Amino acid sequence: MAGSTGERPFSDIITSIRYWVIHSVTIPSLFVGGWIFVSTGIVYDIFGTPRPSEYFTETRQQAPLISDRFNALEQMDQFTK
């Protein structure tokens, strides 16, 4: 049951001027936006991940790994102190 779906072939799309006019702006802006998102530290606040300087503290020099899934909240409290 071969047939046409009515869509444009991919080769027609990527060889069109309209495609490159649109994507010459959107692709670089995604990279710049991502770079700003990470370099300003907003990504750490939004996703709740520790900043690179917060992985190890003066009192704790090992990796903060959860070893007991039933007492995970207690272990997290110990890591954040």
Swiss-Prot record:
* Molecular function GO terms recorded: electron transfer activity; heme binding; iron ion binding
The record's section on InterPro entries has:
PSII_cyt_b559_asu (IPR006217), PSII_cyt_b559_asu_sf (IPR037025), PSII_cyt_b559_CS (IPR006216), PSII_cyt_b559_N (IPR013081), PSII_cytb559_asu_lum (IPR013082)
Enumerate the UniProt keywords alphabetically: Chloroplast, Electron transport, Heme, Iron, Membrane, Metal-binding, Photosynthesis, Photosystem II, Plastid, Thylakoid, Transmembrane, Transmembrane helix, Transport
This entry's comment on the bound cofactor is: With its partner (PsbF) binds heme. PSII binds additional chlorophylls, carotenoids and specific lipids.
What Pfam families does its record include?
Cytochrom_B559, Cytochrom_B559a
Entry's Gene Ontology BP terms: photosynthetic electron transport chain
Similarity section = Belongs to the PsbE/PsbF family.
Quaternary structure annotation from Swiss-Prot or TrEMBL: Heterodimer of an alpha subunit and a beta subunit. PSII is composed of 1 copy each of membrane proteins PsbA, PsbB, PsbC, PsbD, PsbE, PsbF, PsbH, PsbI, PsbJ, PsbK, PsbL, PsbM, PsbT, PsbY, PsbZ, Psb30/Ycf12, at least 3 peripheral proteins of the oxygen-evolving complex and a large number of cofactors. It forms dimeric complexes.
The protein's name in its UniProt record: Cytochrome b559 subunit alpha
**What organism does this protein naturally occur in?**
Euglena gracilis
Q: Which gene encodes it?
A: psbE
